[in-house]
Amino acid sequence: MAYAQYFIGNSYLNPLTDPKVCAVSLANVTFEPGCRNHWHIHHAKSGGGQLLICTAGSGWYQEAGKPAVSLEPGMVITIPGEIKHWHGAKADSWFSHIAVEVPGEETANEWLEPVDDASYAALESPAGEK
């Protein structure tokens, strides 16, 4: 699958596990400054979801209807299944995280609309800094 279509800006995906060998998918994802993925949902009948282990730079994580969370190295974000969210780099920083796909029953990712530029830019303003 070509994931670039689900990102604004450039990101780099480095799988850390082989799905033929390991049931848990881990990947290092690096976002260039300003890069973010689209809103998306990790669906699962049970279990599922995603963990983000922040490793470098500064980024954002946001769930639909909630304020964005500023991400820094060492932080771990737990995203249950069925939560609409997005994540990516801040405008002035590269950002990397290890993405862990939590095993579950009948899991599937649904990619949705892009995070619009105005909403993203508002996060970067001093009043919007979280």
What are these regions (language model features)?
Residues 1-25, 108-130:
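A short, N-terminal "cap"/entry segment at the start of jelly-roll beta-barrel domains
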Residues 21-22, 46, 66, 92-93, ...:
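Short strand-connecting beta-turns/loops that link adjacent beta-strands
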Residues 28-32, 43-61, 100-102:
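Short, conserved beta-strand element in jelly-roll/cupin
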Residues 38-40, 61-62, 79, 84-91:
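Short beta-strand His + acidic residue motifs that chelate non-heme Fe in jelly-roll/DSBH
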Residues 65-82:
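Short acidic-glycine-tyrosine-enriched beta hairpin
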Residues 78, 92-111:
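A short hydrophobic beta-strand segment most commonly corresponding to one strand
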